[in-house]
């Protein structure tokens, strides 16, 4: 690219109405991308764990709550570049210092956040470790289910 970064590989997991458009764009711009389509959960997790950075590209206005894939990112122990507008997730990502929140639909902010994590291995590793801690504290079903039961029982 124009900044001299040429050893990035993007792995796009999942499917959607713009998949073909993204594939064409990546080919036209000569971006190293692997488009997997939908994967079985186990395959997705294995591939996710091999990644250095996760990008959570949620369409503006889409997700009103914390979605399952952010738990997968956290469990994988990788930092997140987050475009999701959900305040709960933005705040928890910030509190745990587990990634970078960017303005939804700001491609420049997203690219800059990826570049920051790419260029600074120390931050990338620290944010990944923090995200794993987030998974253990907030997304571990054994812990969270017990908290739900206690709340229901009024304890």
Predicted regions and their residues:
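Nucleotide-activated donor-binding/catalytic signature segment of Leloir-type glycosyltransferases, i.e.
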Residues: 7, 11, 20-46, 53
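Short alpha-helical segment that forms part of, or immediately flanks, the ligand-binding pocket
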Residues: 42-46, 67-76, 89-91
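A short, well-ordered alpha-helix in the C-terminal region of glycosyltransferases
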Residues: 109-112, 116, 123-138, 147-150
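Flexible glycine-rich beta->alpha loop in the catalytic core of nucleotide-sugar glycosyltransferases
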Residues: 60-61, 68-71, 79, 84-88, ...
């Amino acid at each position: 690219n124009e900044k001299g970064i040429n050893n990035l590989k993007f792995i796009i997991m999942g499917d959607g109405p713009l998949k073909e458009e993204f594939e064409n764009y990546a080919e036209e711009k000569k971006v190293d991308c692997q488009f997997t389509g939908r994967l079985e959960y186990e395959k997705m997790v294995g591939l996710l764990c091999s990644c250095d950075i996760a990008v959570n590209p949620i369409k503006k206005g889409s997700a009103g709550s914390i979605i399952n894939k952010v738990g997968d990112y956290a469990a994988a122990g990788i930092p997140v570049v987050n475009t999701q507008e959900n305040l709960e997730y933005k705040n928890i990502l910030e509190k745990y210092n587990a990634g970078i929140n960017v303005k939804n639909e700001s491609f420049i902010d997203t690219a800059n956040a990826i570049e920051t994590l790419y260029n600074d291995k120390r931050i990338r590793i620290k944010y990944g470790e923090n995200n794993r801690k987030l998974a253990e504290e907030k997304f571990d079903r054994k812990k969270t289910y017990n908290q739900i039961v206690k709340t229901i029982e009024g304890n």
